[in-house]
Amino acid sequence: MPFTMTDENVPEGLTTDDFILRPITAADAEPDYAAVMESREYLRGWEQTGWPADDFTVEANREDLEMLERRHAERRAFTYTVMDPAETECLGCVYFMPTDARSFAGARITPVGDRRWEDYEAAVYFWVRRSRLETATDRALLDVLRTWPAKDWSLRGHLIVTSELFTQQVGMIERAGLQLRFTVEEPDKPGRYLAYE
């Protein structure tokens, strides 16, 4: 299902005691790069590719962020940086993808139970930098992502999606009580993605 909300239904961000979510821009390249490279080992499992390579550069990251910023402005998908309250350190990233995105078109999506993929409007992915896992920033972010889309967005259902290879995040999501609704197998990916509600 494509995104149906109007511009006024896309939040400019969210501020909590622990972090700030705001649309990512190319100007975030350096702090985002620091978070990405600190977390690169587990991001490769989360992404199920070789990204980020050990020789990934700030400039290459800036190019990626320019694309994400364009996609956000065009309302095709929405990417938010997760910053500490002082906005001096990037803590991670959140991605809202429409459930009719190209990556899903070629995937084998298998329901676990009686849910239908087309009843959900967004697939939400997120990661938190490695040094913030021990402070449970990932759990605090997950708690926000369970309620924020229903409260401040006009989404008709959303799923929290992660890679089965990212076992730390899978365990954290399941301990939070979310239920597995779908498995998603993308061609040329070594593992499945798991979609929770």
Locations of the language-model features?
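GNAT-family acyltransferases
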Residues: 1-131, 148-197
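Conserved acetyl-CoA pyrophosphate-binding loop and the N-cap/start of the following alpha-helix
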Residues: 132-145
